[in-house]
Every structure is written in C-alpha cells, then in structure tokens.
Amino acid sequence: MKNEIAAVVFFFTRLVRKHDKLKKEAVERFAEKLTLILQEKYKNHWYPEKPSKGQAYRCIRVNKFQRVDPDVLKACENSCILYSDLGLPKELTLWVDPCEVCCRYGEKNNAFIVASFENEEENKDEISKKVTRALDKVTSDYHSGSSSSDEETSKEVEVKPNSVTATPSPVYQISELIFPPLPMWHPLPRKKPGMYRGNGHQNHYPPPVPFGYPNQGRKNKPYRPIPVTWVPPPGMHCDRNHWINPHMLAPH
C-alpha cells in the first residue's frame, strides 16, 4: 500500500509543480498531509488478494458533478493552501488498487497506468521515475490531441464558406436570400357595428335605432300611444248613433 500511495502523492505533486503557483515548502507540506490522509483511509479497505474490491471507495475523482475531491481538499486545508492553487484538471480520475495505480484525463478518454508494482521493495526514486514518465507522456498526448482537434475544427469552418461561394446558385439572388418576400395576407372582414366582446364591452358604438323600433341595446320600454277619452263641449248631446247639436235645430 505504501508504494501505491507514494505514486499518487508523486502524481499530485508533479501536477502542482507544473502549475507553479505554490512554493516548494507548501508543496512538500501538501504531499505529507495527503499521504497521511490516504493511509488512514485505505488501511481497512485494502485487499491484495482481490484488487478490484473497494475500488470505488479508494478512487480519487474530479469532474463536473464533483468539482472537488474531499480527500484532496482536506489535505489542502491541513496544509493551509487553497485548492485552486493546485491547478488540477477539471476532469481527473485516479484508481488506487493493490499493485497498480491508473489515471484518466477527461471522462471520455482512455485510462493509462501511472505505476505498477510487482513487490513492495521498490524505492521512492523508482516510483518517482515511473510516475514522471507516465505523466509526461499522457499530458503531451492529451494537449496535442486537443490542439489537433481544434485545428480540424478551424479548417472545417474555413472550408465551408468557400464551398458555398464557389458554386453560386443561378436562381436565387442575394437580396432574396437575405430579405425573403413577405407572405400575402388576406384582409380580415370588418366587424359589424354593434359587436360585443366577451368581457361585456363594446367594440364600436351601436347604430341609431330607427323610428318606431324599440332600442335593443337598452332596457327602456317601447313607445306606446296613451289612449285619450274625448269629452263633448257644453251644449252638445249625443245618443248612441249620432251627435245632436241643439243650436242647429233652433229656427232661424
């Protein structure tokens, strides 16, 4: 277990020194605290007869879902340094198993072996050389792969506009491509006066009501003529069938 933990600590110190944000004393203090934390964590979860057992528990992982590894953060706090000063990648996974330590940069890349051990007799210099060789190789491949993909992407971006302008279309003009014609819309029929909205308000004033018709928009009663009883003047009498004027019957 000592060799595997030493490989992990060398791996982290190598990354921190490449970032060149911490002093040598701070890096050594961080390496010492991380070694003690991993030894305490792994001592009851180490199975040489079955290396895959407890692998998830021993794993050191940093990604978009877990941006800070708790063990590494604890080592930073115990050594009085900031986690951000380590300069770790945004996606990093370390599997610490008996006789082998593996790493993966990024969640979609392939894993590589940081160090493998056949016995516990290897000294720190040999472990440091193994970690350094593996780390130098993977970091160079990782950065060169990302840069080559960026160059391919930029080439594709440059080629696509040329392919379009090399074969112009004889049908469409630039003005048609930039400013397409507006669709033709049929005018809506005008609303009849007196239409009402659903909320009870009028859209327009209702037309005047013709003479003799009741006003449909109001609740007033329609006009009805009042019956008048005719009363004959004094001196005029009438029977059932005709009127009799006494002045007309007097002799002249």
UniProtKB/Swiss-Prot annotation:
SMART domains: btg1
Any Pfam family the entry gives: BTG
GO biological process, one term: negative regulation of mitotic cell cycle
Region feature (Disordered): 138-165
Known function: Overexpression impairs serum-induced cell cycle progression from the G0/G1 to S phase.
Family stated for the protein in its record: Belongs to the BTG family.
Record protein name field: Protein BTG3
Lineage: Eukaryota, Metazoa, Chordata, Craniata, Vertebrata
